[in-house]
Curated annotation (Swiss-Prot):
The keyword Amino-acid biosynthesis applies. InterPro entries: Trp_synth_b_CS (IPR006653), Trp_synth_beta (IPR006654), Trp_synth_beta/beta-like (IPR023026), TrpB-like_PALP (IPR001926), TrpB-like_PALP_sf (IPR036052). Pfam families: PALP (PF00291). GO terms for cellular component: cytoplasm. Its cofactor is pyridoxal 5'-phosphate. It comes from Bacillus licheniformis (strain ATCC 14580 / DSM 13 / JCM 2505 / CCUG 7422 / NBRC 12200 / NCIMB 9375 / NCTC 10341 / NRRL NRS-1264 / Gibson 46). Gene3D superfamilies: 3.40.50.1100. PROSITE patterns: TRP_SYNTHASE_BETA (PS00168). The beta subunit is responsible for the synthesis of L-tryptophan from indole and L-serine. Signal peptide: none annotated. This is Tryptophan synthase beta chain.
Length: 408
């Protein structure tokens, strides 16, 4: 029986609560409130109603028939978290935590964001619940994700650009935690992934677990069996934990995909489990990318949502026990997979999700037709069009020109 975390917030060797004394009481208050409410029928009814009526759950399970034909191997199914309100899985957790904050009497939300999807989700639920919202976002990510920055402001949130470090997700999280330490009386810190001190990895998993539960039931209805392999991208790892949680005790192969950036043998990657070592980041013991002196090495990925130097402690545990296999995909491989899905199925995935797709395509090609691969499509790619234009505009124009020439 899989029963993690334990009472100390540990997933095997990983997790825990490595925070200053000033945060111990706020964390204990959040844990107490969550444990009281998570099985409360009234709370669950309110949460489920929001998921159904506001976010649009359950999300679809799509058989990618044209893509499957083109690759010529196993059947590929997509769990469509891109169809959620706000365009990604992040809203699942944001709605749950906002409801929790409201029940605790908090009036203001704090959030960190990388790709901007959690920031948008936090700003969205703040508007819905009549709460104020402040979002910390690295300057580099503000530049990469200007569309989401504008969306957050349009929703009434204050967006604070963070210039320290590399100006990415790690730095935004640092600043969000610092701000929370000073304002924890009336502010609720809404962490966006299965990272941070206990109870956050547990809370976020519980507010994302419907991804796997829905997908498992939907897949069984279509195939009268379980998928052979389940694939999801991993930055902090909330969409992956949400997907994997329903299959942990089943005989299904689980594969998490990290960002290899320019290659795991270069300094430019965010492959935490592939290349990292044990350490503490943002209050949790996990794997992280660090040098021999314990200094964090700045991660890199084309994807703003995957360039985090740590990983959720449950993923660290699942890696250590061997239950989940963790692999990595480069920027170029992810962008190629994004183009292939877009061109064959008319679905534009987020660059984060494209990392999972690239690995899934590689796996599917090597399997016979009767096998199946289920992929968590964690979000849509509208937010990435600006980045893709920079990377692909010349390539796409050349392809179109070639097609015109061929027609003549």
């Amino acid at each position: 029986m899989y029963s993690y975390p334990n009472e100390q917030g540990r997933f095997g060797d990983f997790g825990g609560k490595f925070v200053p004394e000033t945060l111990m009481q706020p964390l204990e208050e959040i844990e107490k409130a969550f444990l009281e409410l998570k099985d409360d029928p009234s709370f669950q009814k309110d949460y489920q109603k929001l998921l159904n009526d506001y976010s649009g759950r359950p999300t679809a399970l799509t058989f990618a028939d044209q893509l499957t034909k083109q690759l010529g191997g196993a059947k590929i199914y997509l769990k469509r978290e891109d169809l959620n309100h706000t365009g990604a899985h992040k809203i699942n957790n944001a709605l749950g935590q906002a409801l929790l904050a409201k029940k605790m009497g908090k009036t203001k939300l704090i959030a960190e964001t990388g790709a901007g999807q959690h920031g948008v989700a936090a700003a969205t639920v703040a508007a819905k619940f009549g709460l104020s919202c402040i979002v910390f976002m690295g300057e580099e990510d503000v530049a990469r994700q200007s569309l989401n920055v504008f969306r957050m402001k349009l929703l009434g949130a204050e967006v604070v650009p963070v210039s320290s470090g590399n100006g990415t997700l790690k730095d935004a999280t640092n600043e969000a935690i610092r701000y929370w330490v000073q304002h924890c009386q009336d502010h609720f810190y809404m962490i966006g992934s299965v990272v941070g001190p206990h109870p956050y990895p547990y809370i976020v998993r519980e507010f994302q677990r419907m991804i796997g539960e829905e997908a498992k039931a939907q897949f069984y209805q279509l195939e009268q069996s379980l998928p052979d392999k389940v694939v999801a991208c991993v930055g902090g790892g909330s969409n992956a934990i949400g997907m994997f949680s329903a299959f942990i005790e089943e005989t299904v192969e689980l594969i998490g995909v990290e960002a290899a950036g320019k290659g795991v043998d270069t300094p430019l990657h965010a492959a935490t489990i592939t290349k990292g070592t044990k350490g503490v980041i943002h209050g949790s013991l996990t794997y992280l990318i660090q040098d021999e002196y314990g200094q964090i090495i700045e991660p890199y990925s084309i994807s703003a949502g995957l360039d985090y130097p740590g990983v959720g402690p449950e993923h660290a545990h699942l890696h250590q026990t061997g239950r989940v296999t963790y692999e990595s995909v480069t920027d170029d491989e992810a962008v190629s997979a994004l183009r292939l899905l877009t061109e064959t199925e008319g679905i534009l995935p987020a660059i984060e999700s494209a990392h999972a797709l690239a690995k899934a395509f590689e796996i599917a090609k090597e399997l016979p037709r009767e096998k199946s691969v289920l992929v968590c499509l964690s979000g849509r790619g509208d937010k990435d069009v600006h980045t893709l234009m920079k990377v692909l505009e010349e390539e796409v124009n050349q392809d179109v020109q070639s097609e015109k020439t061929a027609v003549r």
